[in-house]
């Protein structure tokens, strides 16, 4: 049996969270309805359910704040981002801000991987750049200690 706190279980939780955020952005359905739909999915068996719940509710509870934190690092308004990029960036911003137990490089890498799978051809580069800049702000000490000197 898969341990629900393994990296692959968390990766799956992020993937489902991205899909749930995308659905919420497009349809505006109640988060409880969206969550119930995903929990009933047969493919959800090896997902870290608690992490999925925390990410989904955390992002949706802080959308405005997350968008405000992302804005200085965007080359366009949040509303002009593709729905996939918007969901990935919000998810990454939430993890950078609230999940100090997850190294910032893991957060950025997971965002890149989601963008490669679900985003447009080069959206992973954009996601990487935005989340890297945000990490320097939100996790200054962690990002500074691991960066080579210029």
UniProtKB/Swiss-Prot annotation:
GO terms for cellular component: cytosol. Pfam families: NusB (PF01029). InterPro entries: NusB-like_sf, NusB_fam, NusB_RsmB_TIM44. It comes from the Bacteria. Keywords: RNA-binding, Transcription, Transcription antitermination, Transcription regulation. GO terms for biological process: DNA-templated transcription termination; transcription antitermination. One of its GO terms (molecular function) is RNA binding. Belongs to the NusB family. Involved in transcription antitermination. Required for transcription of ribosomal RNA (rRNA) genes. Binds specifically to the boxA antiterminator sequence of the ribosomal RNA (rrn) operons. PANTHER family: ANTITERMINATION NUSB DOMAIN-CONTAINING PROTEIN, N UTILIZATION SUBSTANCE PROTEIN B-RELATED. This is Transcription antitermination protein NusB.
């Amino acid at each position: 049996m898969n341990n629900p706190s393994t990296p692959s279980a968390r990766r799956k939780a992020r993937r489902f969270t991205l899909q749930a955020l995308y659905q919420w952005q497009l349809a505006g359905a109640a988060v409880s309805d969206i969550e119930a739909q995903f929990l009933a999915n047969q493919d959800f068996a090896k997902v870290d359910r608690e992490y999925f719940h925390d990410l989904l509710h955390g992002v949706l509870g802080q959308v405005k704040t997350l968008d405000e934190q992302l804005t200085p690092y965007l080359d366009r308004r949040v509303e002009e981002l593709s729905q996939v990029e918007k969901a990935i960036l919000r998810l990454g911003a939430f993890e950078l801000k609230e999940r100090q137990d997850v190294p910032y490089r893991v957060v950025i890498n997971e965002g890149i991987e989601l963008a490669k799978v679900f985003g447009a051809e080069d959206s992973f580069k954009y996601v990487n750049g935005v989340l890297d800049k945000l990490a320097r702000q939100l996790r200054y000490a962690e990002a500074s200690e691991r960066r080579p000197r210029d």
